[in-house]
Structures are given as structure tokens and as C-alpha cells.
Amino acid sequence: PPSIRHALNGANVIVNLSASDETTGKDIYREELVGGQSARLLCGYIYASAGDGESTQDVVYSAHNIIAENGRILKKAKRFANETVYSEIDVLRLNAERRRMTTFETRMDGYTEIPFALKIEETELTRYIDPMPFVPGSKTDRERRCDEILSIQAMGLKKRLEHTHCKSAVIGISGGLDSTLALLVTVRAFDLLGMDHKNIKAVTMPGFGTTDRTYDNAVSLIKCLNADFMEVSIRDAVNIHFRDIGQDPKVHDVTYENGQARERTQILMDIANKTGGMVIGTGDLSELALGWATYNGD
């Protein structure tokens, strides 16, 4: 279809002026086709069908207008009603998704572009934007998604542990969400390998900002999962380091924060060396996107 050529040349919104006549069940096929094409091309797809005034011959047109984005139908008109539908297409998100792929060009040689002017008007947002797009609303779907995420991560870690012949896994537990998830994944990987949870070296490393709540959470979690609990305070070591480099401990700047992160990483690495283990990272994609990491500081 022409839409493929346009998308390959960088078009992120396809407008299809169509005259598709009506037969029984064709509306479902049409919606699947439009939604599927928008997913394949990573684009917004506006399908504008002919209405009831198009022809007096032996065919009928229903004005079945559809707006889709990356596989999702945003709006569709009621057939035979000559309705106007409108919605918003998240072009920036589509562009971001395309940058992760090498299929789509900015423009290929020989492709004709026709410039035009369009007045931009401020309008009210009609489309619902989910503040948590990766979290299903249904409890059943949410549990299935969480189990799937844990299984994917656990299988990846299982393969890595097998490949490196590591005898243990070493993980820093803060009591926060990231390290909690990493520990749960590690436990599942060990279960898949049939390894004792005591070979998981779960280390708490209290620092200047550690609260009783996060510390208690960490200890309770480790004991509940029957991992090997270890505690190493970083306060004395970090104070010595600050003295060596002339850092005032009262100045809570990036050096203050990273000094603690680096000390924790050193401890975990040394324990891993001592036990023939692997350090399990607790960073997440948000950290990666923002350019900083729990691992060894920024």
C-alpha cells in the first residue's frame, strides 16, 4: 500500500481517503486493518470513508471514519450517521518509538514532498492519557503482567548465572522498590536453578540517610525470603574518604551522594569476589533515561 512508502520516508501520520462499500461484517475487518496498519507503520492513521451521498449505484457507503495510533483505535464514527470524529495523535511518542528502529528514514531520494501551511489552534484535550500506561487497570491483567515481568527477568538472570558458573548472587538491599524487585527476581532465578536461597548474599549498608523504616523493611524482606543477611555500615568508611578528599560532610552535594553509592558498590564487588558470586544490579530504566545510576553513582 502507498502508506508503507510514505512511512518509510518519514511520514508519521497517514491520511487515507477511502471509498470502501459496505457488506456484512466489513466494519470489523476495516477496523482491524486500520489498527494493524498503524501498528506496523508506527504511525497515526486517519481513515476517512465516503458517506451516503457518494453514489446512487448498487453499493452503499457508511462514512465509517476511524482514527488509530500504533495499533489502538482512538475514535471511530457510528456507521451510516455521517459523523465527524476527532482525537489527538501523540506524534512525539511515535517519533520516539521510531528512533529505536532503523526501518524508517527521514526522507529517501526521489520522494516528493509538498509543503503547506497549517494554522495551529489551541484546543482542549479530548483523549484520555493514562498516567500509568504500563500498569493494567484490571487486577487479573495486572497480576499476569507482573508475573510475566518477573519471569522474563528471572530467566535472563538464570541464563547468566549458568553461563558464568557463579556460586552466589550479591545484592544491596535498601528497603526501596528497586532493590526489592531485584531481590524477588533473584529468588525466582535461584528457584529455577534449584539453588539454596542462602547463596543469595543480601547486604544492607546503612549510611547517613538511612531511616529506621527503610532499614526494617530491608531486614524483614531478606529474612522472609530466607536469603543470607549481611550488614555493613558505610558511615566510617565514607567519613574517612571525605576527609581524604577534603569534602565537608555537612555539604549535601553530588559528591556527598555519590561517595556513598561508590562505597556501597565497592563493598558489593568485594563480597562477590570473596564468595565467587555476581553483583545483581538494582538500577531501573528511569535511571538509565535520566543519566544516573544506583550502581557506582552517576
Predicted regions and their residues:
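Flexible inter-domain linker/hinge segments
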Residues: 1, 84-85, 89-161
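CN hydrolase (nitrilase-like) catalytic-core segments centered on the catalytic cysteine
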Residues: 2-85
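Active-site adenylate/phosphate-handling loop in enzymes that bind or generate adenylated species
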Residues: 4-12, 190, 225, 249-298
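Secondary-structure transition/capping motifs at alpha-helix termini
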Residues: 40-41, 72, 160-167, 188-200, ...
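A conserved beta-strand->alpha-helix junction
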Residues: 84-86, 115-133, 195, 199-255, ...
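Glycine- and acidic
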Residues: 131-145, 164-173, 202-204, 248-254, ...
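A phosphate-binding catalytic loop at a beta-strand-loop-alpha-helix junction
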Residues: 149, 153-194
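Short glycine/threonine-rich loop-to-helix capping motif typified by GTGT followed
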Residues: 173-186, 213-217, 245, 294-297
